[in-house]
């Protein structure tokens, strides 16, 4: 029997509902429960796949090929439970499904309305694809009071009535701001946020109050009194130095104990040793390295959320602090490469789309190759590494990607077909933008004796992809003559997945996104190895 915990947010956006949900999931998991986490997004897009990174941030890709909200990355990193397509829904997808049913006649001529048809579709999603999970935590995107979120709030209100308190719990995350001129915390925004939630029929069972300092006992009791919750169910969500300290902080505030009491569960205390170990390593590093991230969406760092976390995971594994130097690739198109990159111990070029800033990334690759600085190219970063080698080593001075327009030497081109298991998948360049991607987990065979095979410690791996362009195998022979090794291929040998330069301290480009599978307690081997190479570069060891 799965129990449902619904997490809502109020007062302002960006309070950290995703992290709060992930941390609560980790605490319940540490008590021995099996958990599942889901995100309900109120926006009208079908998925975030075609949204601007500046608008939405990172698109998190699951093994089964769903393009989802970045909060699912938090869920996976904190619990280790792989997210699935059924763990993220948007208003756009809900309405698409409802309209499709209406067109098929599934509603038998009824007038299709938000209640009950849209709310029923939301409830169906919440309860679907669950087996033996003890808890399903559902985060409702947006802020209470938004027009877009009303159908979702109504749906979870109905679920609360249908399933009863024995199987449902409502958690509300609010802000308790400190007013310097008054010298005190203010509880009124929280009171009004709960009032707004009550207006749609939801009484929260627990309040998580974001604040930058301890909430005095008197203020906690005041919030409890006016918001109709138990005093110990007012949980201060204090600012902490590292997000991986959040589960420890929430446990110290009694959050998981309140949840267990609500459901009448007698569970053992959580084992938080691995979180304590992670926090200790973050607080007491034995050195530090600086990694240059040469990207194009750096004005919104959420665009690279999983990437930044994976680099920090590599730092945890090597017991060093990782400083990230974010650099807009466009500045390298006018020069200044040495000035920006010389102080760095490693260079990483992440994924991206489009020509803007692309050849600045090529210059960053050239610097890393010629100066023997550890280089890690991910997705677009691998393609730029191949273009750099084709131009400066193989003699194809006009080598480019068809993504940027027609060219005589397209060393990178649009994929039109590939194998997924025993099935041939095809895409057309004229198809919908959201339907032309190679998405999800695909296997890759690693070359015997290669650096990546040594790093992974196995011959076949599975990694997550999100791309529509691929390195052209027609140039493989000429590129390998220059010293660029194609060390990872799809099992059918058609698609190049990894390139490396054996005669280099550390130079690896991958077509997939390894950052999506990295966790603080299980760092991805490529990031662990890359940071180790950066440590050697910095002469720390």
Curated annotation (Swiss-Prot):
It catalyses: UTP + L-glutamine + ATP + H2O = CTP + L-glutamate + ADP + phosphate + 2 H(+); L-glutamine + H2O = L-glutamate + NH4(+); UTP + NH4(+) + ATP = CTP + ADP + phosphate + 2 H(+). It holds the Pfam family GATase. Residues 290-540 form the Glutamine amidotransferase type-1 domain. L-glutamine binds at residues 54, 352, 380-383, 403, 468. Keywords: ATP-binding, Glutamine amidotransferase, Ligase, Magnesium, Metal-binding, Nucleotide-binding, Pyrimidine biosynthesis. The keyword Glycoprotein does not apply. It comes from the Bacteria. CTPSs have evolved a hybrid strategy for distinguishing between UTP and CTP. The overlapping regions of the product feedback inhibitory and substrate sites recognize a common feature in both compounds, the triphosphate moiety. To differentiate isosteric substrate and product pyrimidine rings, an additional pocket far from the expected kinase/ligase catalytic site, specifically recognizes the cytosine and ribose portions of the product inhibitor. This is CTP synthase. It comes from Paramagnetospirillum magneticum (strain ATCC 700264 / AMB-1). The lineage of its organism: Bacteria, Pseudomonadati, Pseudomonadota, Alphaproteobacteria, Rhodospirillales. The gene is pyrG.
């Amino acid at each position: 029997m799965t129990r449902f915990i619904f997490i809502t947010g109020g007062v302002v956006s960006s309070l950290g509902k995703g992290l709060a949900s992930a941390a609560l999931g980790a605490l319940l998991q540490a008590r021995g429960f099996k958990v599942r986490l889901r995100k309900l997004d109120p926006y009208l897009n079908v998925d975030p796949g075609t949204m601007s990174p500046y608008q939405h941030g990172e698109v998190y890709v699951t093994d089964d090929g769903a393009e989802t909200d970045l909060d699912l990355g938090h869920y996976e990193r904190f619990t280790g439970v792989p997210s699935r397509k059924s763990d993220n829904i948007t208003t756009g997808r809900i309405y698409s499904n409802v309209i499709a049913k209406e067109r098929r006649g599934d509603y038998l001529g009824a007038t299709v309305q938000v209640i009950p048809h849209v709310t029923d579709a939301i409830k169906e999603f919440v309860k679907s694809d669950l087996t033996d999970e003890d808890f399903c935590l559902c985060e409702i995107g947006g802020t209470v009071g938004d027009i877009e979120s009303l159908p979702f709030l109504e749906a979870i209100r109905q679920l609360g009535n249908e399933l009863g308190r024995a199987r449902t719990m409502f958690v509300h995350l609010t802000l308790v701001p400190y007013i310097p001129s008054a010298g005190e915390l203010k509880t009124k925004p929280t009171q009004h946020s709960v009032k707004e939630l009550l207006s749609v029929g939801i009484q929260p069972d627990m309040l998580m109050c974001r604040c930058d300092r301890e909430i005095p006992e008197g203020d906690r009791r005041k919030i409890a009194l006016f918001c109709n919750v138990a005093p110990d169910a007012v949980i201060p969500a204090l600012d902490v130095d590292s997000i991986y300290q959040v589960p420890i902080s929430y446990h110290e505030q009694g959050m998981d104990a309140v949840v267990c009491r609500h459901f009448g569960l007698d569970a053992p205390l959580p084992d938080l040793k691995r979180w304590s170990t992670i926090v200790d390593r973050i607080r007491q590093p034995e050195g530090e390295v600086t990694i240059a991230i040469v990207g194009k969406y750096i004005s919104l760092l959420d665009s690279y959320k999983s990437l930044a976390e994976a680099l920090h995971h590599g730092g945890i594994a090597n017991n060093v602090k990782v400083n990230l130097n974010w650099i807009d690739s466009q500045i390298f198109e006018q020069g200044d490469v040495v000035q920006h990159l010389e102080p760095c111990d490693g260079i990483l070029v992440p994924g991206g789309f489009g020509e803007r800033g692309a050849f600045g990334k090529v210059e960053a690759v050239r610097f890393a190759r010629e100066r023997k600085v550890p280089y890690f190219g991910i997705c677009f970063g691998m393609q730029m590494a191949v273009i750099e080698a084709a131009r400066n080593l193989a003699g194809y001075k006009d080598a480019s990607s068809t993504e940027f327009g027609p060219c005589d030497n397209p060393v990178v081109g649009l994929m039109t077909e590939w194998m997924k298991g025993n099935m041939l998948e095809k895409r057309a360049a004229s198809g919908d933008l959201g339907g032309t991607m190679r998405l999800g987990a695909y296997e890759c065979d690693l070359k015997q004796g290669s650096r990546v095979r040594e790093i992974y410690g196995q011959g076949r791996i599975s990694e997550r992809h999100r791309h529509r362009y691929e390195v052209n195998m027609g140039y493989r022979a000429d590129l390998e003559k220059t010293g660029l090794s194609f060390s990872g291929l799809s099992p059918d040998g058609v698609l190049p997945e990894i390139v490396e330069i054996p005669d280099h301290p550390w130079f690896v480009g991958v077509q997939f996104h390894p950052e999506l599978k990295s966790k603080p307690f299980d760092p991805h081997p490529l990031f662990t190895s890359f940071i180790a190479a950066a440590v050697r570069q910095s002469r720390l060891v």
